[in-house]
């Protein structure tokens, strides 16, 4: 019953919500207006999404405690102006994230704002910290995530 309630809420809150959608307990998605999912998408327990336009195509599997983070603080200059507190040096704009079809994201993976695309048929290893785009058919892992091998 709880899954049906979460699914019903998502269909009303998300920009788009396909059939076969599953949202596990403890997920945080904010207002959902920037969040679109295709068919057969499963978001894992305690999934957290902040500040991004997210489009997920069909057939996504996700483990527990996955984070999609966007925006953030400027890091390209490593907060080099020491006369200004880091918190006052401003943040970065949100960047869209597109996730292709047939993707598996392992537990505790973190997708940061530097990643704008996770390619179709790819696998993100458990605990990976994804800072850059992931090509189609790639298996990535580590911190920062790197291509381990290609599935095809």
What kind of region is each of these model predictions?
Residues 129, 144-147:
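Conserved switch/coupling elements of ABC/ABC-like ATPase nucleotide-binding domains
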Residues 17-18, 138, 142:
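Secondary-structure boundary/capping signal
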Residues 1-28:
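Extended, small-residue-rich solenoid/repeat segments and analogous flexible loops
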Residues 134, 150-151:
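Short beta-strand->loop
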Residues 27-37, 42-118, 143-144, 151-152:
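Flexible, glycine/small-residue-enriched loop-and-beta-strand segment within the central core
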Residues 111-139:
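C-terminal/domain-terminus segments
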């Amino acid at each position: 019953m709880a899954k049906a309630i979460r699914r019903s809420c998502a269909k009303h809150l998300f920009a788009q919500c396909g059939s076969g959608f599953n949202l596990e307990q403890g997920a945080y998605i904010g207002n959902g207006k920037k969040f679109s999912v295709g068919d057969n998408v499963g978001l894992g327990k305690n999934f957290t999404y902040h500040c991004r336009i997210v489009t997920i195509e069909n057939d996504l599997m996700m483990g527990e405690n996955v984070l999609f983070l966007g925006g953030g603080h400027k890091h390209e200059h490593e907060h080099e102006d020491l006369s200004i507190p880091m918190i006052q040096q401003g943040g970065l704009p949100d960047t869209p994230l597109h996730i292709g079809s047939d993707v598996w994201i392992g537990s505790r993976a973190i997708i940061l704002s530097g990643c704008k695309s996770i390619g179709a048929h790819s696998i993100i290893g458990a605990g990976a910290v994804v800072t850059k785009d992931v090509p189609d058919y790639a298996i990535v892992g580590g911190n920062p995530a790197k291509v381990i091998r290609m599935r095809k």
